[in-house]
Amino acid sequence: MTAATDSGPSRASRLRALAVACLAALLLLLAAALLLAAALRPGVAWAGPDSPRSAIVSLGDSFISGEGGRWLGNGSEPFGTRSGTDRAAVACDDLGFCDYEPERIYGASEANECHRSDVAPIRSAPIAVDAQVNLACSGARARNLWPADLGGRPHFGEPPEADQLAEVAHRLDVRLVLVTVGANDVGFGSLVAGCALDWARSDRAAPELCHGYAEAEIDTLLPRARHRVARALVGVERTMRAAGYRRRDYRLVLSGYASPFPASRWLRYPESGWDRLTEGGCPLWDADADWAAGPGIDSIVAALRRVAAGAGAEFLDLRHALDGHQLCDRRSHLVGTAGPSEAGAEWVRRLSFTQGTSRESLHPNAYGQRALGRCLALLYARPRGEWSCRAEPGRAIGEAMRVEALGGG
């Protein structure tokens, strides 16, 4: 008599299969727990374009970081609150003496002079997102935006801006990246400062003009600057791709600049005398003001527009975004005893060595930055393309700004 055989799986094999199934379930639970822990731990989660929290981000230099955001126009009074224009003035006494706390405006970036203001364009733009992230830093050049592995350099003790963008892009759903850089690569600010010095050490009978040598310097440096700005855009795209973004998931916008000065026909102080320096903070000869407001800024903007087109990025022309509110423009005025008003005030910080820091000079002030933020919001509401913002003199920011398609080549 023989023993009966079991045609199904042996007891041992069934136990082995059960153990494998239990182990797999345990591993799945462990993986889920780790993912949940990462999601709850700040700085670790990798959500990227799938994040429930949306964001817009700015990279670049002082024009977009918020340098000059301390000021609401330019005051006629040299002390105290400076006619109500100095947002850093605190604890003012009955005699009008005040303490000054610029960190109220620039936060932690006051310490390293990146000067990211609380009204920087990316922060003041009325765009419905969860986070408005300002990574721009005063004084940055294009190389400070490149990722470190592309040769990017730290600036003011901070990593390259593209590497900072990587952390934001992993954590948030970045809808727009605004890049404003290139002016420092051609030394535009230093050249304009030289124009002011030329004005101060010469007279109307024999003026020392800057626009000839300044234009030659910009023409020499522009080819290299174009290459470096283009590399910055490549770095942004590569950073976003590494974070899981497709090109259609976000908007990449390269913006130009606005001159701090209007054309000479709008200047409210004469060339002779010292009023352009002591009253207005706009010490330029007429011919140099015309260059700064015209060919000087035009050549930089044209170069940046070509870079944007070559990179497949959008372009935002800001040459007219401060019209009627530039330094010493007779369509605006200094702030008097009535206090600041955005409709009539200048939107650019005057050249000053006695109030705040000289680094703030010739940058959009708090009003100018809010105006640029309004411009950015208008662009964001339009389809992808090339756009230009234009301000209407004598009107408040919400009424003054309009955006239009940028024509020409």
Language model region names:
Residues 31-54, 67, 131:
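C-terminal region of N-terminal signal peptides and the immediate post-cleavage residues
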Residues 341-398:
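Histidine-centered active-site loop/cap adjacent to the catalytic His
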Residues 5-27, 361:
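N-terminal export and membrane-targeting signals
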Residues 189-223, 246, 259-297:
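Serine-dependent acyl-ester chemistry module
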Residues 259-363:
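Mobile gating loops/cap/lid regions near enzyme active sites that modulate substrate access
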